[in-house]
Amino acid sequence: MKEETIEILFQYRQAFASDDEPLGAIKGHEVDIILNVERPYPLLLRGPAYPASPRAREALESNINELMKLGVLRNVGHTVEVEVTTPVIITWHNDKSRMVGDFRALNTYNIPDRYPIPRIHETLTQLSKERFITSMDSLKGFHQNVLTPHSRKLLRIIAHCGIYEDLRMPFGITNAPSHYQRIMNTIFPHKLSEGG
């Protein structure tokens, strides 16, 4: 069993993170964010940067630099017209920082994606009949969803140090779980719904 697992992992090694590509991208699929509002966009969607303490500013800069290295964010030049900006904040958990976009304003205009999300009790009921269970986790799963050029313009974040464009799906967008579930059901069409 161990040798078979190693052989499968080696055969599909391009599907796993590496030093050369620490964050993968779902190939052949782009996420399109559609808003239920006409241009020019309301001022509500042009949020200013939130005030931040020196500690939070340092953490924001660190988070932004990490996401830029991973190809999740890019700096928006000063000559680019920016119609939508979402402020970001830093949250702390066990002295570790995480940057979070305040997408509440954008989400009010986001057309909901009603793709079904499995309920945990149904999943656990299906799994209870199985003898072996395999668990897989994606590093920064939402960030593996590439955004369309149109969506990138809607998902620009603003901080004290500049304006940045999301190239991948950020956390906090209303439809992110639905998009991700659709991808998982496409990759594993029967395994997620039937067990086994």
Located regions from the model:
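Extended, low-complexity cationic-aromatic segments
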Residues: 137, 150-153
